[in-house]
Design a protein with these regions (language model features):
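Multi-pass membrane proteins that catalyze or facilitate reactions on polyprenyl-/lipid-phosphate substrates
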Residues: 1-277
């Protein structure tokens, strides 16, 4: 793998992980579009690179959200130390809600690994998911924000639903942030609050998936430079994606992302149908 390819894929992963456009879908489409075959048939090496990019993205996003992460960890730990004799309130309740969202996502992830191992490799399905979930994102985001709820206003059953929705993103093209933003907006969560919720929900899932996959990863000596460069590119672009989306949603909606998904999906299907790629 060239350093240029590593930089491009790192930037693509970091930017699209938190924008509602599907990072896994883009990581399949970009090499397919340009005819890159950096890994050949070595699926284990490709998965190792994917883990590196996700861990880079995790570092960038965690750094950006560090005050929120520390705040909710402290609140949750304080509630646990108090003996959990009373129902959590405020930040402690939000911390518990975030923890609950990770459970169904983790269970679905383990089921995917145990039954199929990998849901990628079908470009037509990635394109279809981009279109379908792009339309759903547009529909969900049309909700009026004047009665918007905060994270703390969600119920624990809402948290389970959000976690299940996040689990759908194991299929490339769905988008973890896109599907959870759609559900959060359907649950009447205010737009910027929904984005912050989605980012915080994703951190333990990305970390858990990365650690689980890292246990089975072996990186050949000659591959360390592109792995490190890709990870750094993903960290920087992941930080930037969180920053840009939060600023953007303070002023406008998600319609532009929905339109991009639909156009990209139909573009890929057209290339497939005409035999260009």
């Amino acid at each position: 793998m060239s350093i240029l390819h590593a930089i491009v894929l790192g930037l693509v992963q970091g930017l699209t992980e938190f924008l509602p456009v599907s990072s896994s879908g883009h990581l399949e489409i970009v090499p397919w579009l340009f005819g890159w075959e950096d890994f050949g048939s070595d699926v284990r090496l490709e998965n190792a690179f994917d883990v590196a990019l996700h861990l880079g993205t995790l570092m960038g996003a965690t750094y950006y959200l560090r005050s929120d992460v520390v705040r909710y960890l402290r609140a949750g730990w304080g509630w646990l130390r108090s003996g959990v004799g009373t129902a959590p309130t405020g930040d402690a309740r939000t911390s518990c809600l975030l923890a609950v969202t990770a459970v169904p996502t983790g269970i679905l992830g383990l089921l995917v690994v145990a039954t199929t191992g990998d849901l990628g490799g079908r470009t037509w399905l990635v394109a279809t998911c981009l279109i379908v979930f792009g339309v759903l994102l547009w529909i969900a985001d049309r909700r009026d924000d004047r009665d918007g709820r905060g994270m703390v206003d969600l119920s624990f059953s809402n948290a389970v639903v959000l976690g299940l929705a996040q689990g759908l993103a194991f299929q490339p093209g769905v988008s973890r942030s896109g599907v959870t933003l759609s559900v959060a907006r359907t649950l009447r969560v205010e737009r910027t609050e929904a984005a912050r919720l989605v980012f915080l929900m994703s951190l333990p899932v990305i970390a858990g998936a990365g650690l689980l996959s890292a246990a089975d990863v072996t990186v050949p000596a000659g591959w360390w430079p592109p792995f490190i460069v890709g990870m750094v590119a993903a960290a920087v672009s992941g930080w930037l994606a969180v920053h840009l989306l939060l600023r953007l949603l303070a002023r406008t909606g998600l319609g532009g992302f929905a339109a991009y998904r639909v156009v990209l999906g139909f573009g890929v299907l057209t290339l497939l149908a005409t035999g260009v790629r």
